[in-house]
Amino acid sequence: MTAYTPWTGFFSASVAQADPELDRVLRAELSRQQDQIELIASENIVSRAVLEAAGSVLTNKYAEGYPGKRYYGGCEEVDVAEELAIERAKALFGCSYVNVQPHSGAQANGAVMMALVKPGDTIMGMSLAAGGHLTHGAPPAQSGKWFNAVQYGVRLQDASIDFDEVATLAETHKPKLIIAGGSAYPRIIDFAKFREIADRVGALFMVDMAHFAGLVAAGLHPSPLPYADIVTTTTHKTLRGPRGGMVLSNNPDIGKKINSAVFPGLQGGPLMHIIAAKAVAFGEALRPEFKVYAQAVIDNAKALTDALAAGGLNIVSGGTDTHLALVDLRPKALTGNIVEKSLERANITTNKNGIPFDPEKPAITSGIRVGTPAGTTRGFGTAEFTEIGKLIVEVLDGLAANGEDNSQAEAAVREKVAVLCRRFPIYGGL
């Protein structure tokens, strides 16, 4: 019987050598990231070290279970990697329990619901239309189908959370779980008010801090952990790690339930290469310079929104306390779907986004969402974000004047974007 011999280059060939077709895709995406200004609030740019860990030999290792209690042998080194991630996360957020295994923020939220509520129970979260997230009980999501999901919103006058409505809904529906946090809410959330309401009706209180976790880690945003029974987050966005999820708590009983919900409840083997990359990112976030970065993210968001407002746009809620903002396009009689495409042709990446009380359909929208984490990672400061705000206004004014044939304004802005991106390169040598 002939023994198998790996084909030539199996252990040595690069992607370019082994798969030129895919290599072209990777090169094109690298160029896109290098040449476009990334303003999508949920995206960031990881360090070379995080990239290296995510592409490491740990991708080969199956490790069902938890450190010291695996269902496979050979887990000595991945145990160390996972423990590093856990201990660094505990240090970052000042908590006693962390699970770093969720593959995503949605998986982290799903694990909380599997652990703490039953199908048919009532949960309460911010509506998608008000800036919440799909996984907080939106009708199309699993959480909206499996649970009796009650949704609260924001006030018409200032687009801030309507705590009178939150209290009334909680008293009326007696939810088992109340959720704070969202994907398009730019203001600091009053966690103490939520805690008070949850205690009044006997509910557990969960905070999804996926968007602002990096600001919390830097000490520049109030931490939800003193108030919430359970906290979930992604590990990318402002935390600037690989794409993934995490669950945190100071309640050991809840921690045991979460561990069982993550594995074997929702997932099998954890992605050990991603957990290693999380450990690297958490180590970076523990450095003093990360606080400087996080402060710059906040300062840059204010500079960007000031420039957009000066250009005749409305900023939902009047501004931002965080890394993101919602821009109301109605003063220029534009819609988010058209603006997103025009800005992308100018090499500025945003996403169309509904605004509170939006009259447009979700596929159209009256707004766009912008964020500063990725641009700040490149090195953009307030001067650059002021310029970026002006470039956005230039594209939008062209759209308002010329309709969808906005090629002249897009070309002019694209040239200015190229100059800016060349000044702040990323991933040299890749």
UniProtKB/Swiss-Prot annotation:
Query: Where does it mainly reside?
Result: cytoplasm
Q: Where in the cell is it found?
A: Cytoplasm
Q: Which GO terms describe its molecular function?
A: glycine hydroxymethyltransferase activity; pyridoxal phosphate binding
The top EC class, named as a word, is transferase
Q: Which PROSITE patterns match?
A: SHMT
What SUPFAM superfamilies does its record include? PLP-dependent transferases
Q: Which NCBIfam families match?
A: PRK00011.1
Subunit structure, as described in the record: Homodimer.
> Can you name this protein?
Serine hydroxymethyltransferase 2
Give the species this sequence originates from: Rhodospirillum rubrum (strain ATCC 11170 / ATH 1.1.1 / DSM 467 / LMG 4362 / NCIMB 8255 / S1)
Q: Which gene encodes it?
A: glyA2
